[in-house]
A protein has these predicted regions:
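Conserved acetyl-CoA pyrophosphate-binding loop and the N-cap/start of the following alpha-helix
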Residues: 97, 101-109
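Conserved beta-strand in the GNAT
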Residues: 61, 67-76, 92
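Conserved active-site alpha-helix within GNAT-family acetyltransferase domains
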Residues: 104, 116, 128-146, 151
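A short, internal acetyl-CoA/4′-phosphopantetheine-binding micro-motif in the GNAT/acyltransferase core
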Residues: 88-98
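Conserved GNAT-fold acetyl-CoA-binding loop/helix
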Residues: 25-48
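Conserved GNAT acetyl-CoA-binding A-motif
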Residues: 107, 114-125
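A short helix-loop-beta-strand connector motif used in the catalytic cores of GNAT acetyltransferases and
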Residues: 48-61, 87
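Conserved N-terminal entry element of GNAT/NAT acetyltransferase domains
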Residues: 1-12, 154-155
Length: 177
């Protein structure tokens, strides 16, 4: 099997980042979340981060044998409690790369990236319905810290349209610039 290489994403990767972002909703979602909104928001965030040049915001492309097989977006954020830490905003692999070690290698990079910056913690968010990802994270040593509950309160399902720009952080996290 060909070795896996990681490289920084460039503007030439915009299309492949959009395709990989679509994988982030390849499981049962809450009724108020639309797959295209998730893919659009995450691909926009990755494309912007790749173009920013911010050293505390990195987007990587994983390649094997010249083919793109995954991506990672990791950044430094400050949580609600004031703790600056690493945060995996996006990790995605192609369907063909599932179970081949690509995601594990990307997570190893995220951990190393976080440690190199002297940050004490690495966090991520995952939808409750993404059982495969949750098992992967737990096997990698991640533990549940907080559970977010949501409830629709009117007949109109929530949407991100008209409610500000979606971003890759949870509401209690802000990127560090």
């Amino acid at each position: 099997m060909t070795d896996l290489t990681l490289r920084r994403a460039t503007a030439a990767d915009d299309q492949v980042l959009a395709v990989l972002a679509a994988r982030l909703s390849a499981f049962e979602l809450p009724a108020w979340r639309a797959p295209h909104e998730i893919a659009d928001a995450d691909s926009r965030a990755m494309i912007a981060a790749a173009a920013s040049g911010n050293p505390d915001d990195e987007v990587l492309i994983a390649e094997r044998g010249g083919e793109v097989v995954g991506c990672l977006h990791v950044l430094a954020v400050t949580d609600f409690f004031g703790l600056r830490h690493g945060h995996v905003s996006v990790i995605a692999t192609t369907e063909a790369a599932e179970g081949s070690g690509v995601a594990r290698r990307l997570m190893e990079h995220a951990e190393q990236w976080t440690a190199e910056r002297g940050l004490p913690l690495l966090t991520l968010n995952v939808f409750a319905g993404n059982a495969r990802a949750r098992r992967f994270y737990e096997k990698g040593g991640f533990r549940i810290e907080m559970v977010k509950y949501a409830k629709t309160v009117n007949s109109q399902p929530p949407t991100s349209k008209g409610q500000g720009t979606p971003n890759s952080q949870s509401p209690n996290e802000t990127p560090n610039s």
